[in-house]
Regions:
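Redox-cofactor binding/interface segments in oxidoreductases and associated redox assembly factors
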Residues: 80, 98-99, 143, 229, ...
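Beta1-alpha1 glycine-rich phosphate/pyrophosphate-binding loop at the start
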Residues: 1-65, 154-177
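A Rossmann-like FAD-binding core segment of flavoenzymes
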Residues: 13-15, 57, 63-84, 91, ...
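Residue-level detector of alpha-helix initiation sites
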Residues: 1-2, 23, 102-104, 124, ...
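FAD-site-proximal beta/loop scaffold in flavoenzymes
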Residues: 113-137, 213, 220-279
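Glycine/serine-rich phosphate-binding loop and adjoining beta1-alpha1 elements at the start
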Residues: 73, 79-80, 87-140
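Hydrophobic Val/Ile/Leu positions in short beta-strands of Rossmann-like dinucleotide-binding domains
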Residues: 18, 119, 143-144
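Rossmann-like NAD(P)H-binding beta-loop-alpha module
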Residues: 124, 128-177, 211
Length: 279
């Protein structure tokens, strides 16, 4: 959406079409846990723009619930599936921008198909967790991952009265912070009644006694009514790979200083691309 808006500002005449496989085009990820915790009660407050408002402002066609399934750079088209109707069609392009973003990291662990195991990345994920809580009233949760989303979710589940445990493979939360600063975070989190299990790696999940047990590398397990996997994200680049684009670190899309990929007239931006770190 950001790239599309910028193109419109540079070119008032260009025909711009955006395909988005989810039902939402612009939302604040860090606000999602606060909808689960009832701090945000109106779901419309999660979104910054709608397809209608975006078209009204920028004259850009935003086709939500449309998934691009293939790129044909030899004839400069993409294959698209309408997720509501099942219709499939091809759309031509002069220039193509890939911005698939990132998906929750899903390690190859046993029990990943457990019904009470969730991830939190999209608005749809948020509604799924919220609906489960409203319908089943879980009393406890285990969150795997101690980054921003994991901590915000822990805060909100605790506010709902749930017993919350965070398990982290490293020996501190918030790895970008120095250990002495992380110590203050640990103290604050524990002060609010959240349990920390640090330096323990998750090895799998098993549904048991109406809940889910999170299996740890030391042979122990953490029981919860639900579990949430929040261990980071991975570039979502399967389309680029299938189209033959050059990939780099962790499967990210390689681009030059102009954000051009290895294929002419295809650009890429966002969480899916490889960038230079100048520090």
């Amino acid at each position: 959406a950001t790239a599309a808006a910028r193109i419109r500002r540079l070119n008032e005449q260009a025909e711009i079409v955006v395909f988005e496989r989810s039902g939402y085009i612009s939302y604040a990820n860090c606000g999602l846990p606060y909808y689960i915790g009832d701090v945000i009660t109106d779901p419309e407050e999660l979104t910054l723009q709608t397809p209608e408002s975006f078209f009204s402002r920028f004259r850009i066609m935003m086709k939500v619930l449309h998934e691009v399934t293939a790129i044909h750079h030899d004839r400069k088209t993409v294959s698209v599936r309408n997720l509501k109707t099942g219709e499939e069609f091809e759309e031509g392009y002069d220039k193509l921008i890939l911005s698939p973003g990132a998906k929750p990291t899903q390690p190859k662990l046993s029990g990943m198909e457990a019904n009470k195991l969730f991830t939190l990345r999209t608005v749809e994920d948020t509604f799924k967790i919220k609906a489960y809580i409203n319908n089943n009233h879980p009393k406890s949760a285990v969150i795997a991952g101690g980054g921003f989303i994991g901590l915000e979710l822990a805060e909100n589940l605790r506010e709902l009265g749930m017993d919350v445990t965070i398990v982290q493979s490293q020996k501190q939360l918030m790895m970008p912070f120095d250990s002495d600063m992380a110590a203050f975070i640990h103290a604050e989190v524990r002060k609010h009644g959240i349990h920390l299990v640090l330096g323990h790696k998750v090895e799998g999940f098993i549904e048991k006694d109406g809940g889910v047990n999170v299996l740890l590398s030391d042979g122990t397990s953490l029981p919860g009514d639900i579990a949430v996997l929040a261990i980071g994200v991975t570039p979502d680049t399967h389309l680029a790979k299938e189209a033959g684009l050059e990939l780099g670190v962790r499967g990210s899309i390689v681009v030059n200083d102009r954000m051009e990929t290895s294929v002419p007239d295809i650009y890429a931006a966002g969480d899916a691309v490889q960038v230079k770190h100048f520090v």
